[in-house]
Curated annotation (Swiss-Prot):
Species whose genome carries this gene: Vibrio vulnificus (strain YJ016)
Function: Catalyzes the reversible reaction in which hydroxymethyl group from 5,10-methylenetetrahydrofolate is transferred onto alpha-ketoisovalerate to form ketopantoate.
Binding residues for 3-methyl-2-oxobutanoate: D45, S46, D84, K112
Catalytic activity annotation: 3-methyl-2-oxobutanoate + (6R)-5,10-methylene-5,6,7,8-tetrahydrofolate + H2O = 2-dehydropantoate + (6S)-5,6,7,8-tetrahydrofolate
Identification of the protein by name: 3-methyl-2-oxobutanoate hydroxymethyltransferase
InterPro entries: Pantoate_hydroxy_MeTrfase, Pyrv/PenolPyrv_kinase-like_dom, Pyrv_kinase-like_dom_sf
Binding site for Mg(2+): D45, D84, E114
């Protein structure tokens, strides 16, 4: 697989070519994903739940993400590698720069941060200092205590309009990817259409430029709960490599997620 950059994703968006992405946490699975030419991997703070056994992502530290970023980069030298910035690691622009630098040195090509237009100054500071940013909107798991649980976001018109404005503001500030989680498919389509940057969805219908799944959900090995928008591709294939290939094939064809795996 050739080295993937943000320019490839932008070109694919312009061409209408959909792409699949996944979380990854170690070198072995990263190597598996690279063998199937998975273009983008995310070292997600979801590791707090699927690896550390926590109830949410809040306990994850920058050091945790940096460690797993090094592991994933070792297994997948050519993917575009995103790394989550954990809870309260970007409370100020200055703090964000310091912590993002640690993740970039660990091998990330981009950092992902959760939140709306209040992050504009942070995104500007990061991108002006050569740190690419993915902006995460919708259900932002680090805000679980504000939301009162993991709930669909943007269902009413006012909140939907606000999310569109947030997405445009973050793009203007320099965000190069927007990730939408658990938002109505109609809203995801609207945001995907108005943005020039690639939009990745999870639980947001099949209209976004890309899709992402938590690796453990894709393989049906999550310990407690399988979200409705996820699909066990391993159950259909009986082989992990074939499962990854099937996931990528269905995303590229626009057949995943289908209605059964769309939550709103």
């Amino acid at each position: 697989m050739k080295k993937i950059t943000i320019n490839d994703l932008i070109k694919w968006k312009q061409e209408g070519r959909k792409f699949a992405t996944s979380t990854a946490y170690d070198a072995s699975f990263a190597q598996l994903f690279e063998s199937q030419e998975m273009p983008v991997l995310l070292v997600g703070d979801s590791l707090g739940m699927v690896l550390q056994g926590k109830n949410d992502t809040l306990p994850v530290t920058v050091e945790d993400i940096a460690y797993h970023t090094r592991c994933v980069r070792a297994g997948s030298p050519n993917c575009l590698l995103m790394a989550d910035m954990p809870f309260m690691s970007y409370a100020t622009p200055e703090q964000a720069c310091e912590n993002a630098a640690q993740l970039m040195r660990a091998g990330a090509n981009m950092v992902k941060i959760e939140g709306g237009d209040w992050l504009v100054d942070t995104v500007k500071m990061l991108t002006e200092r050569a740190v690419p940013v993915c902006a995460h909107l919708g259900l932002t798991p680090q805000s679980v205590n504000i939301f009162g649980g993991y709930k669909v976001q943007g269902r009413d018109q006012e909140k939907a309009d606000r999310m569109v404005k947030d997405a445009l503001a973050l793009q203007a500030a320099g965000a190069q990817i927007v990730l939408l989680e658990c938002v109505p498919a109609e809203l995801a389509a609207r945001i995907t259409q108005v943005l020039d940057v690639p939009v990745i969805g999870i639980g947001a219908g099949n209209v976004t430029d890309g899709q992402i799944l938590v690796m453990h959900d894709m393989f049906g090995i999550s310990a407690n709960y399988m979200p409705k928008f996820s699909k066990n591709f391993l159950a259909e294939t009986g082989d992990m490599r074939k499962a990854v290939a099937l996931y990528m094939e269905q995303v590229q064809a626009g057949t995943f997620p289908d209605e059964a795996h769309t939550i709103a």
